């Protein structure tokens, strides 16, 4: 069994914030994979189901970000799980939007949600770092993470969340390579190989056929050619 935790802040006010991308990811997984309805438990909300062969409990702590470890610790104790059975999905300033990285252990890098987890369960859990980019100035970080994703970012965000959901069974099974491939297939799909599409009426328009090298439109007839043609008509 695995416990997959999405980090964020509860309430409609924060729902679309960059800091809540962990919540967004587990909500997408629950919706796409037929999990049970969300219900209150462990100082948060849980949904239960399966990802491939793995039984999974999804958790959204309702303690606010800075106390996330309280909720996760309670869930772990009840479910009798070790830190290596926990996968935490969280926002990552040091990755560009659309990028994800998997990591086990290590420091919290100033992330308050991870700081709380370290205090309550140690650092041996797995984590999926979901890139949100950096505002460029550390003094702007607090406002940046608590601001909503821009409209221009929505399409890329949706592709990323779909990719995470597509690879969720691999994530739960510990198949990191297959998970990363699933994300990449959504975020950076293979470009057209150059073959003609089955239905050229859809997608990119066909390129016009190339003109032959001796296309008469390319070089209009000279005056002498026109006079010669006129002479031929009256012979």
UniProtKB/Swiss-Prot annotation:
Residues 225-235 have a biased composition (Basic and acidic residues). It comes from the Bacteria. GO terms for cellular component: cytoplasm. The record marks 9 as: Discriminates between blocked and unblocked aminoacyl-tRNA. The record marks 91 as: Stabilizes the basic form of H active site to accept a proton. Its EC number is 3.1.1.29. Its main location: cytoplasm. It is an enzyme of class 3 (hydrolase). GO terms for molecular function: peptidyl-tRNA hydrolase activity; tRNA binding. The active site is at 19 (proton acceptor). One of its GO terms (biological process) is protein quality control for misfolded or incompletely synthesized proteins. TRNA binds at residues 14, 64, 66, 112. Keywords: Cytoplasm, Hydrolase, RNA-binding, tRNA-binding. InterPro entries: Pept_tRNA_hydro, Pept_tRNA_hydro_CS, Pept_tRNA_hydro_sf. Residues 188-235 are annotated as: Disordered. It holds the Pfam family Pept_tRNA_hydro. Hydrolyzes ribosome-free peptidyl-tRNAs (with 1 or more amino acids incorporated), which drop off the ribosome during protein synthesis, or as a result of ribosome stalling. Catalyzes the release of premature peptidyl moieties from peptidyl-tRNA molecules trapped in stalled 50S ribosomal subunits, and thus maintains levels of free tRNAs and 50S ribosomes. Monomer. Belongs to the PTH family. This is Peptidyl-tRNA hydrolase. It comes from Paracoccus denitrificans (strain Pd 1222). The gene is pth.
């Amino acid at each position: 069994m695995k416990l997959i935790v999405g980090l964020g802040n509860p309430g409609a006010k924060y729902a679309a914030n960059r800091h809540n991308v962990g919540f967004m990811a587990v909500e997408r997984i629950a919706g796409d994979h037929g999990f049970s309805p969300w219900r209150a438990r462990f100082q948060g909300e849980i949904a239960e189901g399966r990802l491939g062969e793995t039984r999974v409990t999804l958790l959204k702590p309702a303690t606010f970000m800075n106390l996330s470890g309280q909720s996760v610790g309670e869930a772990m104790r009840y479910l009798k799980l070790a830190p290596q059975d926990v996968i935490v999905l969280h926002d990552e300033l040091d990755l560009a939007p659309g990028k994800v990285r998997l990591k086990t252990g290590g420091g919290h890098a100033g992330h308050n949600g991870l700081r709380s987890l370290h205090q309550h369960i140690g650092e041996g859990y797995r984590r999926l770092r979901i890139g949100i980019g950096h505002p460029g100035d550390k003094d702007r970080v607090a406002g940046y993470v608590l601001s909503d994703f821009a409209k221009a970012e929505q399409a890329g965000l949706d592709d990323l969340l779909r990719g995470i959901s597509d690879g969720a069974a691999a994530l739960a099974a510990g198949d990191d390579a297959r998970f990363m491939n699933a994300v990449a297939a959504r975020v950076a799909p293979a470009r057209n190989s150059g073959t003609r599409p089955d239905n050229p009426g859809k997608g990119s328009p066909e390129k016009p056929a190339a003109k032959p090298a001796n296309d008469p439109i390319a070089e209009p007839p000279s005056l002498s050619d026109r006079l010669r043609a006129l002479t031929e008509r009256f012979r």
